[in-house]
């Protein structure tokens, strides 16, 4: 057991160095996209979002959503799934747990 611990302690700096070297470029890429994608909407984007929601409601009322191509329908489904998943992530963060609320 002591031999195992000694080997682990000797190899730890090399493993940590390799992990840092491996993750630095990926972390830089993550931060680049996080700064671009995770910003709140600007005031100029809010009217466009409202117009888009009105367009969705109108297509649901008139039935024009039936004329979508398969690609458009799949993309709309993926966007809806992404919005739903971010809602669930916010719920998990707010609850500070995956299951139930602490009351």
Curated annotation (Swiss-Prot):
Q: Which domain of life is it from?
A: Eukaryota
Primary location group: mitochondrion
Record-listed N-acetylalanine modification sites: 2
Q: Which GO terms describe its molecular function?
A: proton transmembrane transporter activity
Report keywords, A-Z.
Acetylation, ATP synthesis, CF(0), Hydrogen ion transport, Ion transport, Membrane, Mitochondrion, Mitochondrion inner membrane, Transport
**Where on the chain is N6-acetyllysine found, per UniProt?**
11, 24, 35, 54
Q: Which Pfam families does this UniProt record tie to the protein?
A: ATP-synt_G
Q: Which positions make up the signal peptide?
A: none
**What GO cellular-component annotations does this UniProt entry give?**
mitochondrial inner membrane; mitochondrion; proton-transporting ATP synthase complex
Question: Which GO terms fall under biological process for this protein?
Answer: proton motive force-driven ATP synthesis; proton motive force-driven mitochondrial ATP synthesis
Could you tell me where this protein is found in the cell?
Mitochondrion; Mitochondrion inner membrane
Q: How does it assemble?
A: Component of the ATP synthase complex composed at least of ATP5F1A/subunit alpha, ATP5F1B/subunit beta, ATP5MC1/subunit c (homooctomer), MT-ATP6/subunit a, MT-ATP8/subunit 8, ATP5ME/subunit e, ATP5MF/subunit f, ATP5MG/subunit g, ATP5MK/subunit k, ATP5MJ/subunit j, ATP5F1C/subunit gamma, ATP5F1D/subunit delta, ATP5F1E/subunit epsilon, ATP5PF/subunit F6, ATP5PB/subunit b, ATP5PD/subunit d, ATP5PO/subunit OSCP.
Family, similarity comment: Belongs to the ATPase g subunit family.
**Function description:** Subunit g, of the mitochondrial membrane ATP synthase complex (F(1)F(0) ATP synthase or Complex V) that produces ATP from ADP in the presence of a proton gradient across the membrane which is generated by electron transport complexes of the respiratory chain. ATP synthase complex consist of a soluble F(1) head domain - the catalytic core - and a membrane F(1) domain - the membrane proton channel. These two domains are linked by a central stalk rotating inside the F(1) region and a stationary peripheral stalk.
PANTHER family, per the entry = ATP SYNTHASE SUBUNIT
Q: What name is this protein filed under? A: ATP synthase F(0) complex subunit g, mitochondrial
Gene name in the database record = ATP5MG
């Amino acid at each position: 057991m002591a031999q195992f611990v000694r080997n682990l302690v000797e190899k730890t700096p090399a493993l940590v160095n390799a992990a840092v070297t491996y993750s630095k470029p990926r972390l830089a890429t993550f931060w680049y996209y996080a700064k671009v994608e995770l910003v709140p909407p600007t005031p100029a984007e809010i009217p466009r979002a409202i117009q888009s929601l009105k367009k969705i409601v109108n297509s649901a009322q008139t039935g024009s959503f039936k004329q979508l191509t398969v690609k458009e329908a799949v993309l709309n489904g993926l966007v809806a799934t992404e919005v739903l998943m971010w809602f669930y992530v916010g719920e998990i963060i707010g609850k500070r747990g995956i299951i139930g609320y602490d009351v």
